[in-house]
Curated annotation (Swiss-Prot):
Keywords: Kelch repeat, Repeat. One of its GO terms (molecular function) is ubiquitin-like ligase-substrate adaptor activity. It comes from Caenorhabditis elegans. This is Kelch repeat-containing protein kel-10. GO terms for biological process: proteasome-mediated ubiquitin-dependent protein catabolic process. Kelch repeats lie at residues 265-315, 316-362, 368-414, 416-462, 464-510, 512-558.
Length: 578
């Protein structure tokens, strides 16, 4: 069955009511309990029932082991162990699945038990969705859900959503979330015109909807034109009522349904402000292109630092090293963005402020954080160390060739590239590359066009390193240059609007690089700007709420923690009438 073959009569327009499936699927059993259950069930069947059962399936009938069916299917477990008259029958009819497909559903959990990842196509996953949900086979159903969600496109997402409403609420929720994320593409390709009225109203009232404010009214107007008055009457009323609402803070120039939360954001932690370490945590709203102070009401000791390292790894915000005005830190703090809990991690082998840091994945996909150089309060460092957050362990790696503090670091092709910096006497013009497989540093093949310390670097397409700003010993720099690892040469790129050192930079998407804060040679600055890699032009952005240097920025994309940072309420007043 192709998903395009689903007729409208087969599709639900709202989530199904809670059923026995929903109640049973919410009860998780440990593997140990299920393994223990198997011999008990086998013994029970041997004493009271035939060990096999004949199933009359879609295309033929076949004999199966009762214990095997019950072990992987809640449906068969209840059927064979209940006191119903049919429980002891040797024959059962299940017309919605063929024998090969039932064998495939039974093979999926067996493959996982052997450490093998199954491989089925999107088409087969769609075909197996209904029978796996009907038979309440939780492991195959979870896997099928993952396969479908990994293959969603703007062309199939609406039909798959409607199919999911019929059979599996968990899948429907995930596909809905994907529609919210992909809606700008649905708009650009006009696929959204096939949405039903209640579906489009539901999307427009979702605060997470990924749609530019300038396009919001066009979506409604074009959808109404595309559909008959009978189909669009409620949509016209909905638009008339809600587009006349007062201007929203995230889109003052356009008529919009409601305030929306951006899918992507830049979060600024720490830094050095006029009165010491910056206390405010700021977030950049990519919808409104402005900074705003956010509430971060978690009492986490020493998470606010300057000249520190910071990474987001597997939903953990990891802060290490740095300076608070009186001491250099050796400590590590981990904050779980999902559970909102924090804990202290292992100490580094050295105190490190002015530290450069980056992350890579080892050959097993395990994330590793590297802290390179810095200052321990007495001298600049050439040492480097690696943090395995899963094991909560810092391990020393090979030393760099030169002492470096306030350098720039970036990950390219799973190697650590450290550039520029200060050794206590000289500002560096060259860089080094660390190969984690060989545990060796080797120099870059050429030097930058100018010496730089207090600079920042970003990776472009995992092949090109872009280094920005800094201090050359005489003045703050507005220049930037790129180094292509394949070519081994440096090339100039357009200059910043504001010369700065000790600032932060990050790449939001494949086309935009953001910089903020720093020291401009006269004072700490609150200015920020963005480079559009397509036009190769810098654009000035609104200022941060306070001037700060030595700050660190991270990006969060489609993350639940953004709900807390932006704190945009669910505007239930919009939909109560509908």
């Amino acid at each position: 069955m192709d998903i395009s073959d689903i007729s409208a009569s087969q599709l639900a327009t709202s989530p199904p009511p809670i059923t026995t499936i929903d109640f049973n699927s919410s009860i998780e059993e440990s593997p140990a309990k299920r393994v223990k259950f198997a011999p008990e069930l086998t013994k029970s069947f041997e004493e009271t029932l035939s060990p096999t059962v004949t199933l009359v399936l879609r295309n033929n009938e076949e004999t199966f082991d009762r214990c095997l069916l019950s072990f992987y299917s809640n449906y068969f477990r209840v059927l064979f162990s209940s006191k119903f008259r049919d429980s002891k029958s040797t024959t059962h009819r299940i017309r919605l699945i063929s024998a090969p497909d039932l064998h495939l559903l039974l093979t999926i959990p067996k493959a996982f038990e052997q450490g093998i990842k199954p491989n089925i196509s999107l088409q087969k996953a769609v075909e197996l969705l209904e029978p796996s949900a009907f038979l309440q086979m939780s492991i195959p159903l979870d896997y099928i859900t993952d396969v479908i969600c990994a293959n969603l496109t703007h062309e199939n997402i609406i039909k798959i959503f409607r199919l999911a409403l019929l059979y599996h609420t968990t899948l429907a929720v995930r596909v809905w979330r994907a529609m919210v994320r992909k809606f700008q593409t649905l708009f650009a390709t006009n696929v959204y015109l096939t949405l039903k009225e209640n579906e489009l109203i539901g999307l427009l009232t979702d605060k997470h909807l990924n749609l530019k404010s300038a396009d919001e009214k066009t979506v409604v107007v074009n959808w109404i034109k595309h559909n008959s008055p009978l189909q669009s009457d409620r949509m016209a009323q909905f638009a008339q009522r809600n587009f006349s609402r007062q201007p929203q803070p995230d889109a003052t120039k356009y008529e919009v349904i409601r305030t929306r939360q951006p899918m992507d954001a830049i979060v600024c932690f720490g830094g050095w402000a006029s009165r010491g370490v910056a206390q405010n945590i700021e977030v950049f709203n990519t919808r409104s292109d402005r900074w705003q102070t956010c509430n971060f009401n978690y009492d986490i000791p020493n998470i606010r630092r300057a000249y520190h390292g910071i990474e987001v790894v597997e939903d953990k915000l990891i802060v290490y090293g740095g300076f608070n005005g009186t001491q250099q830190f050796q400590t590590t703090v981990l904050f779980d963005l999902s559970t909102k809990e924090w804990r202290s991690g292992a100490n580094m082998n050295d105190k490190r402020c002015y530290v450069t840091s980056a992350r890579i994945n080892d050959s097993h996909g395990r994330p590793l954080i590297f802290a390179c150089g810095g200052m321990n309060g007495v001298s600049r460092l050439k040492t480097a160390e690696m943090y395995d957050y899963r094991a909560d362990q810092w391990s020393e790696v090979a030393n760099m060739a030169q002492m470096r503090s306030d350098g720039a670091v970036v990950t390219i092709d799973n190697k650590i590239v450290v550039i520029g910096g200060f050794d206590g006497r000289n500002i560096h013009q060259g860089g080094e590359v660390y190969d984690p497989v060989l545990d060796l540093w080797h120099p870059l093949s050429s030097n930058m066009r100018t010496r730089r310390t207090g600079c920042t670097a970003v990776s472009i397409m995992n092949q090109v390193c872009m280094i920005i700003g800094g201090f050359n010993g005489n003045r703050r720099l507005d220049s930037a240059e790129i180094y292509d690892m394949r070519e081994g040469l440096w090339h100039p790129v357009p200059s910043l609007h504001t010369a700065r050192s000790n600032f932060s930079a990050c790449q939001m998407d494949t086309c935009s690089i953001y910089v903020a804060g720093g020291f401009d040679g006269q004072a700490t600055t609150k200015e920020s700007e963005r480079l559009d890699l397509r036009s190769k032009m810098w654009q000035a952005l609104p200022d941060m709420s306070e001037a700060k240097s030595a700050l660190r920025m991270v990006t969060l994309s489609d993350h639940p923690f953004l709900d807390e940072l932006f704190d945009i309420p669910d505007d239930t007043g919009i939909i109560t009438t509908w």
